[in-house]
């Protein structure tokens, strides 16, 4: 393992292993857009928001739904079958590209696979580990006012925590049940403004299940009728013993839309997950995608982070390798699409991007993020599902979730969400406030590496923005050597940007050396 990746790996252990010392002072970052109180989640999981109650509402018993029953449901069979196909493809690709690296279940293998037998185990189930308000995504489907996400973590139930500080036996897979914030059957009085008001009002009172589900509560309006899709994220393999992929871990991402007429989930294209290999290999798709993305209106949305790429360019699944480091590499989902990325079939040249920037300036379009070829390249990766999950995550997760089954859940040292998640809370709450106040929300977002300046006061000095461990950019000795897309990525006082790549000036904020 090279020095940079070793540093990243150690840092990830530090982030995963302990809550920052001032976490108690930063509770405001968590409030208003997420429910992560352990006691509340326990009660909700055992009640109305247990996964079985939502996916099988006709079930006569309220007992938790183990995987054996979950993946046996007619609605979930397509999910199980699609995951099985992805496993087969992954193993096939591995054997073709790394024939000397063993792959299988258990410690004896160089690449250790996720055990597919867990899908039919009676001793494993998905446990509610967080509820996240994503009304900041209302630009995708305005009539639904965005989304409410119920995030469940796969957990063993046959191994109760033993010991004063024990944690539960959680497994590296999450299931995200995505609900419409405003259901199709809701009456006209249920507006985006009203839903946002309820969520923000919940910030000002102690969390209680009765209030959350009561009249005017933020959860009163959600139920099985709101289900839109399922998103799965699992650690398909990790390589602690590989001679060529030291500490490499791969995460499989999938999306399944709910077909209400058929009462089944169906494999679906992933939002903005560009099918790189297919697009590069097809002249028609190459031509169409290039023209579509460089169109001034689409380019402006691309800069703002609100772009929705047509499905014909998208993939139905993605594998996100971690860690990827700070340099451009073939581990990134869109490597090869931009000139200079090691291929002679690049889709976008520097002249293409410069031309789009000049056209935006001439039209009076104010771009917030993309000011250079490198900015275009970074945005092309972080609008994808895989690219976002590779950036400031905990492994390949942005929300590994609350462990309310731990012996002392309120004192658990497990971080429920990633720096990217917490750094985005100020933006999400501002959007909720705009909805509540009857204003047009600003849905734009910065790069996944750094939050927008709209939360600069609240985030200043934290690891979420410019504090210790934050992502940064080291300016060049001359102004002409500084990339305009990243010149604001500085470090807080007392810290310096330590470059962590071989070919870029990206790095992390650490204490200044003497």
Q: Where do the model's predicted regions map?
A:
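Bacterial N-terminal signal peptides that target proteins for export
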Residues: 1-8
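Conserved small-residue
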Residues: 24-358, 420-421, 427-462, 495, ...
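The canonical Cys-X-X-Cys-His
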Residues: 382-392
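Short, charged low-complexity linear segments at domain edges
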Residues: 347-371, 464-477
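Secreted, cysteine-rich disulfide-bonded mini-domains of extracellular proteins
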Residues: 457-514
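Bacterial N-terminal signal peptides
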Residues: 8-16
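Sec/Tat signal peptide C-region and signal peptidase I cleavage site
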Residues: 19-23
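Primarily the internal scaffold of c-type cytochrome electron-transfer domains
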Residues: 392-441
């Amino acid at each position: 393992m090279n020095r940079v990746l070793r540093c990243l790996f150690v840092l990830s252990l530090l982030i995963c292993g302990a809550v920052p010392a001032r976490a108690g002072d930063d509770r405001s970052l968590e409030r208003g857009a997420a429910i992560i109180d352990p006691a509340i989640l326990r009660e909700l999981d055992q009640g109305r928001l247990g996964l079985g109650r939502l996916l099988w509402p006709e079930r006569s018993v309220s007992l938790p739904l183990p995987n054996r029953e979950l993946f046996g449901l007619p609605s979930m069979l397509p999910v199980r079958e699609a995951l099985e196909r992805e496993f087969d493809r992954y193993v096939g690709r591995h054997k073709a590209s790394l024939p000397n690296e063993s792959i299988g279940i258990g410690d004896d293998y160089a690449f250790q696979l996720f055990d597919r037998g867990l899908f039919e185990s009676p001793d494993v189930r998905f446990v509610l580990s967080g509820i996240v308000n994503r009304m900041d995504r209302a630009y995708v489907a305005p009539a639904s006012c965005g989304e409410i996400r119920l995030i469940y973590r796969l957990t063993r139930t046959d191994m109760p925590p033993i010991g004063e500080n024990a944690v539960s036996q959680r497994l590296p897979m999450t299931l995200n049940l995505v609900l419409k914030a405003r259901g199709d059957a809701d009456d006209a009085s249920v507006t985006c403004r009203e839903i946002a008001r309820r969520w923000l009002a919940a910030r000002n009172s102690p969390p209680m299940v009765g209030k959350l589900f009561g009249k005017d509560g933020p959860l009163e309006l959600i139920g099985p009728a709101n289900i839109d899709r399922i998103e799965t994220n699992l650690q398909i393999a990790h390589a602690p013993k590989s001679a060529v992929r030291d500490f490499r871990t791969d995460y499989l991402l999938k999306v399944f839309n709910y077909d209400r007429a058929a009462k089944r989930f169906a494999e679906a294209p992933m939002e903005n997950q560009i099918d790189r290999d297919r697009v590069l290999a097809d002249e028609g798709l190459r031509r169409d995608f290039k023209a579509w993305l460089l169109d001034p209106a689409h380019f402006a949305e691309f800069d703002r982070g609100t772009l929705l790429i047509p499905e014909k360019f998208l993939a139905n699944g993605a594998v996100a390798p971690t860690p990827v480091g700070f340099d451009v590499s073939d581990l990134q989902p869109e490597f090869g699409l931009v000139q200079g990325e090691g291929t002679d079939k690049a889709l976008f040249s520097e002249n293409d991007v410069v031309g789009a920037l000049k056209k935006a300036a001439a039209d009076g379009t104010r771009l917030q993020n993309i000011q250079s070829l490198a900015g275009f390249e970074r945005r092309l990766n972080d609008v994808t599902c895989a690219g976002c999950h590779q950036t400031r995550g905990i492994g390949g997760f942005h929300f590994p979730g609350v462990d309310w089954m731990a012996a002392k859940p309120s004192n658990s040292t497990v971080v429920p969400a990633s720096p990217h998640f917490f750094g985005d809370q100020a933006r999400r709450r501002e959007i909720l406030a705009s909805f509540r106040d009857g204003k047009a929300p600003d849905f734009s977002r910065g790069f996944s590496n750094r939050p927008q300046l709209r939360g600069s006061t609240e985030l200043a000095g934290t690891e979420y923005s410019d504090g210790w461990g934050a992502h940064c950019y080291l300016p060049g000795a001359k102004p002409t050597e500084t990339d305009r897309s990243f010149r604001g990525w500085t470090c807080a006082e007392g810290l310096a940007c330590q470059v962590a790549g071989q070919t870029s000036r990206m790095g992390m904020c650490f204490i200044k050396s003497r």
